[in-house]
């Protein structure tokens, strides 16, 4: 595909995404399923606009690659070491158990035992792209079940290497003498990548950042991700695993957040392209001729994987309320199956339509996951939010609250407790099941649900409430909720939590003026106490704190247009010098006006 064809394909992809995803969101089936349906519509078995599916599918894997890089940035080597038990324990158990059961069933379906083994391994894998996307949408990424799900996915990526090596052995086409030299060279190259990345990446990015040109920094980030993916692909290893390692190596660097901001737009677009490509690969001809076989295989695949994952989650000690989410989010087949089954087909392991049937099963299983998650979400909402008696009441009670608090983590808890202590009527919404269960045991009225859903806000009393306090962990959720409230509940007074200056800029641009930066107030208070401990008069220290807060807020507002540009660094330095000059002038005047005011606690 080249030239005008490539441009036409790009336009078709963008049109399909723009048309299908908002429609899917309106229907409440999620963006992922919208992308899949869009792919079916424009693919060879739909309207037939695009026929070269394999090439596009390979290119669109870059979406998964970028996603794994960002996941790597959110971890560090010490955190990865802490997850070793769940990665090599639960992850290995899931792959082996699921593969064994599924391989046995494929043998009963007249697959050769070699093809059944490959089929079982391929079907045992889950979709990294879909699972991580859904976990983020459902707020699972910070929960115990989300961490366990990520560990299982990471082991599956590691299992790609031996699984691909197993195919020629099963086909009987492996070299008589195993080439240990090639294996040793791959291991050596992998080690060089790790060591080189460990000691070279930070100095290189420090040099690039010194240029002050954001575009160059973005280009360098893309170069790193694509080079790591290409290098791992040349070694015959998982591209996603390579970029994940690159992300982990940079997780503790000072450029972590800038790297994430540079990659995020590309990740979203390419992930959408990946799901559209998967939808295009669905062979409707095979589905039509083997409808009962495919339908049964999809149900069996999802049920077996859910049962296996649920059992492992129980053995691992995951809360009962989180096990169903964990089991369902990993219940589908994954993108790795396309690679493994294609390799097996080239070795003539499959007969007739067997490969096509397996690929259709994988694709349809991916389409069931968003619907399954939606159903489980509703079931959990009714179960967790329902009254003690089995009477008919809404799944979130509208108690005519004055305030709706979104998020009941450490930040949200303090706000909610203060409001309740002052007899304010509040409703708390939280999508971490574990937190909901724990807080309800202590008597807090906390409801489970995703506050970015309009109907949940409406049933929680948003139409009658006076204010909403947004304390989400993820800035994306905060901004989405702000836009939602401004559109559907414009009367609400919005107050929000900002993790840092970038989030504060975004809130100001969205028209939210009442916000609190996560550590700013506590840091100022500790700074005031430090000034007093160094001999400054308590009243003078208090005034210094107030001056600093006021001038820092002014600087924050002045830098709004530049918040996404590296020019902000020089602007911030100028503002800091101005702040110091004003501060010194005011403090000199303050020293002449001190009275006998003393500190009190």
Swiss-Prot record:
UniProt cross-references to InterPro entries, sorted A to Z: Cation/H_exchanger_TM, K/H_exchanger, K_H_efflux_KefB, K_uptake_TrkA, Na+/solute_symporter_sf, NAD(P)-bd_dom_sf, RCK_N
GO molecular function annotation: glutathione-regulated potassium exporter activity
Spans through the membrane: 4-24, 29-49, 55-75, 87-107, 111-131, 152-172, 177-197, 207-227, 230-250, 262-282, 284-304, 324-344, 356-376
Domain RCK N-terminal as annotated: residue spans: 400-519
Keywords: Antiport, Cell inner membrane, Cell membrane, Ion transport, Membrane, Potassium, Potassium transport, Transmembrane, Transmembrane helix, Transport
Location in or out of the cell: Cell inner membrane
Domain of life: Bacteria
S-S bonds: none
Assigned GO CC terms: plasma membrane
Primary localisation category: membrane
Membrane topology: Multi-pass membrane protein
Pfam family, one: TrkA_N
GO biological process terms held by the UniProt record: proton transmembrane transport
Function: Pore-forming subunit of a potassium efflux system that confers protection against electrophiles. Catalyzes K(+)/H(+) antiport.
Homology family: Belongs to the monovalent cation:proton antiporter 2 (CPA2) transporter (TC 2.A.37) family. KefB subfamily.
Subunit structure: Interacts with the regulatory subunit KefG.
PANTHER family listed in its UniProt record: K(+) EFFLUX ANTIPORTER 3, CHLOROPLASTIC (PTHR46157:SF4)
NCBIfam families: 2a37 (TIGR00932), PRK03659.1 (NF002973)
Protein's name in the database: Glutathione-regulated potassium-efflux system protein KefB
């Amino acid at each position: 595909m080249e030239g005008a064809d490539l441009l036409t394909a790009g336009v078709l992809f963008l049109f399909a995404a723009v048309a299908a995803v908002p429609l899917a969101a309106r229907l409440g089936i999620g963006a992922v399923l919208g992308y899949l349906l869009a792919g079916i519509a424009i693919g060879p078995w739909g309207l037939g606009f695009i026929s070269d599916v394999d090439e596009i599918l390979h290119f669109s894997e870059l979406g998964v690659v970028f996603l794994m890089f960002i996941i790597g940035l959110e971890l560090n080597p010490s955190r990865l070491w802490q997850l070793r038990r769940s990665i090599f324990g639960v992850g290995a158990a899931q792959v082996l158990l699921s593969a064994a059961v599924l391989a046995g069933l494929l043998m009963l379906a007249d697959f050769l035992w070699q093809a059944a083994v490959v089929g079982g391994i391929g079907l045992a894998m889950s979709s990294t792209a879909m699972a991580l996307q859904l976990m983020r949408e459902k707020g699972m990424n910070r929960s115990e079940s989300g961490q366990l799900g990520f560990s299982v996915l990471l082991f599956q990526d590691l299992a790609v290497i031996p699984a691909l090596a197993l195919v020629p052995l099963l086909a009987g086409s492996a070299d008589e003498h195993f080439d240990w030299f090639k294996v040793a060279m791959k291991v050596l190259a992998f080690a060089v990548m790790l060591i080189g990345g460990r000691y070279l990446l930070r100095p290189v990015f420090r040099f690039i950042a010194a240029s002050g040109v954001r575009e160059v920094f973005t280009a360098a980030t893309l170069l790193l991700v694509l080079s790591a993916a290409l290098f791992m692909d040349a070694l015959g290893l998982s591209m996603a695993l390579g970029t994940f390692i690159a992300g982990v190596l940079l997780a503790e660097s000072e450029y972590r957040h800038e790297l994430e901001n540079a990659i995020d737009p590309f990740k979203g677009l390419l992930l959408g392209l990946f799901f559209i490509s998967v939808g295009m690969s669905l062979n409707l001809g095979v589905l039509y001729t083997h409808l009962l076989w495919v339908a049964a295989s999809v149900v069996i695949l999802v049920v077996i994987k859910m049962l296996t994952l649920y059992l492992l989650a129980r053995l691992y000690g995951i809360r009962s309320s989180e096990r169903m989410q964990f089991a369902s989010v990993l219940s589908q087949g994954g993108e790795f199956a396309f690679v493994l089954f294609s390799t097996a087909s080239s070795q003539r392991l499959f007969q007739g339509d067997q490969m096509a049937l397996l690929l259709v099963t994988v694709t349809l299983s991916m389409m069931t996951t968003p619907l399954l998650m939606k159903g489980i979400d509703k079931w959990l909402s009714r179960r967790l939010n329902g009254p003690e008696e089995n009477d008919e009441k809404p799944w979130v009670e509208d108690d005519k609250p004055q305030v709706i608090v979104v998020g009941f983590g450490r930040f949200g808890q303090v706000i909610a407790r203060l409001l309740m202590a002052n007899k304010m009527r509040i409703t708390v919404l939280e999508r971490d099941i574990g937190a909901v269960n724990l807080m309800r045991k202590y008597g807090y009225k906390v409801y489970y649900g995703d506050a970015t859903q309009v109907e949940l806000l409406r049933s929680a009393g948003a139409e009658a409430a006076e204010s909403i306090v947004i304390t989400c962990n993820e800035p994306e959720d905060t901004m989405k909720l702000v836009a939602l409230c401004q559109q559907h509940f414009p009367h609400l007074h919005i107050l929000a939590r900002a993790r840092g200056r970038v989030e504060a800029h975004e809130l100001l641009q969205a028209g939210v003026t009442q916000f609190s930066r996560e550590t700013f107030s506590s840091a100022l208070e500790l700074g005031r106490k430090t000034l007093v401990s160094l001999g400054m008069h308590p009243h003078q220290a208090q005034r210094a704190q107030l001056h600093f807060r006021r001038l820092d807020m002014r600087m924050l507002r002045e830098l709004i247009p530049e918040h996404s540009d590296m020019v902000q660094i020089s602007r911030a330095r100028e503002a800091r010098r101005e702040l110091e000059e004003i501060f010194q002038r005011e403090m000199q005047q303050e020293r002449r006006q001190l009275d006998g005011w003393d500190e009190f606690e």
